[in-house]
Amino acid sequence: MATIGRRAYAEMYGPTVGDRVRLADTELVIEVEADYTLRAGGYGEEVKFGGGKVIRDGMGQSQRPNGPGPHDAVDCVVTNALILDHWGIVKADIGLRGQRIAAIGKAGNPDVQPGIDIVIGPGTEVIAGEGLIVTAGGIDCHIHFICPQQIEEALSSGVTTMLGGGTGPATGTFATTCTPGPENIANMLRAADAFPMNLGFFGKGNASRPEALRQQVEAGVIGLKLHEDWGTTPAAIDCCLSVADEGDVQVAIHSDTLNESGFVEDTIGATKGRTLCAFHTEGAGGGHAPDILRVVGEANFLPSSTNPTMPYTVNTLDEHVDMLMVCHHLDAAIAEDLAFAESRIRRETIAAEDILHDLGAISMFSSDSQAMGRVGEVVLRCWQTAHKMKVQRGKLPGDPERHDNGRAKRYVAKYTINPAIAHGVSHEVGSIEVGKWADLVFWRPAFFGVKPSLVMKGGFIASALMGDANASIPTPQPVHYRPMFGAFGGALTRGSLSFVSQAALASEVGSVYGLRKPLSAVKQCRTVKKGDMVHNAYLPRMEVDAQTYQVRADGQLLTCEPATALPMTQRYFLF
């Protein structure tokens, strides 16, 4: 039997079992754990498109028409992709049917090839995945919807689902992720029809009586946001959680930095063990000062942090005071406002935040877009943090010297499956699994986490790097991100979801509001616990010294040095 060298094989068909791939210019290396394209019986039955290649009539392409069944041809096939997801790092072909993932396995022509579970036919489009890493579309669960231009920026970074609140550049939206009231909720859902992005909105949860909160759930919010700027008192926390339990929606909390209405113990007590997403479980983003990190040790708090402090660098502290003053409508001329800002920014807790992510104690990663966070840097900063932690802390337990698969799965889960589980949308998005919405992001390994090559929404290309449209080929430089056909017309509204509450779906708000996007209801928001956070369920006993701000997890002091240089930076960007 003819053979081919490993390097030549990888260059032609992509890496296979045992091959390793470096992620961008980081110190992170992943290794292929399994190769589903070998189901035909081994090497030699790979499919590839192009002149003189396999996917031709009667060869790798069958005569079968497209259809809904497993023996029918799929609408699109991604060949020889390297999938990086929370469940594994595998080589596979991916079959897409309609807006969903139909199969992950071996593609080809079952009439002439053995072991085929993805049928290629005359009606099948091909995307060459050889040499590319494919991840699930990212989920940013902390969005201030301040301007619609955020959505294009996020999509170009590999984010395909944005959850948050706001109504545009209103003063309330600058500071809080709330879309308050039925009229504003309806208008934001109407606006969502214009964007190739899955969108869901939080209502305002700050109330001591339930009527106005129920009204927002019925109008279509996927959750309620408690924010200190509206008054996150124990009474408001209790009321909000009670309404959320009735409607099976999530609660997100930004707790009381000033400790005016209670301390962290009072907030924990007010929850009575009920689940909520703890936004700003971090070193400088807000919440009870200085010990909000204590909620990392509570089973009913689903912790996330935002990207401006991640990872901790020599520049982190300098930018934060001014940034905070702007975002929270503070005045540097007022001593109390300045003291408020400075109380939130603590180098010791910022340093601990990096380590808590690496330990899997902080479960999710988000942006806090234009409100002390950068909407296009969720994926980027997540992997920069993983790199920094490997350099400073070494290998994670369970990872051998050869690769960092365990760390890679932990970090990819922070912006994919875990926010999906926490917010009740994991039945639709958050991972590359059969039956889920086909939101896929394609990366050249050298640009992984920095600049995706292609972004698919609902099985159709919505954004891609593209050169001069008047050129004779599609690749002349300079290239930049441009919306593709999946971002226009009916393809846009078929390819993306608007998430709403179960009550809103039952009352047919889509018809009432005149919506065109398909609606999907969030579910199982109230039963999820920290233990359900994939690869990020560590529940340490937390201590934060109120005088020194030192942080300990299970007695271990958490401290690290700020980075003086990072990968995924000036090598890739002019500005």
From Swiss-Prot:
PROSITE patterns (UniProt xref): UREASE_1, UREASE_2, UREASE_3
- Cite the post-translational modification comment: Carboxylation allows a single lysine to coordinate two nickel ions.
The record, for CDD domains, names: Urease_alpha
Q: Where does the record say this protein resides?
A: Cytoplasm
Note on how the cofactor is bound: Binds 2 nickel ions per subunit.
| Reactions accelerated catalytically | urea + 2 H2O + H(+) = hydrogencarbonate + 2 NH4(+)
User: Which residues make up the binding site for substrate?
Assistant: 227
Keyword Ribosomal protein in the entry? The reply is no
Which sites are catalytic?
328
GO biological process entries: urea catabolic process
State any GO CC term.
cytoplasm
Q: What is its main location?
A: cytoplasm
Q: State where Ni(2+) 2 binds.
A: 225, 254, 280
* Superkingdom of this protein's organism: Bacteria
Pathway the protein contributes to:
Nitrogen metabolism; urea degradation; CO(2) and NH(3) from urea (urease route): step 1/1
Q: Which residues carry this modification: N6-carboxylysine?
A: 225
Q: Which Pfam families match?
A: Amidohydro_1, Urease_alpha
Q: Give UniProt keywords alphabetically.
A: Cytoplasm, Hydrolase, Metal-binding, Nickel
Residues that, per the record, bind Ni(2+) 1:
142, 144, 225, 368
Please give one Gene Ontology molecular function term for this protein: urease activity
Cofactors demanded by this protein = Ni cation
Annotated family: Belongs to the metallo-dependent hydrolases superfamily. Urease alpha subunit family.
The record's note on quaternary structure and interaction partners says:
Heterotrimer of UreA (gamma), UreB (beta) and UreC (alpha) subunits. Three heterotrimers associate to form the active enzyme.
- Which protein, by its recorded name, is this? Urease subunit alpha
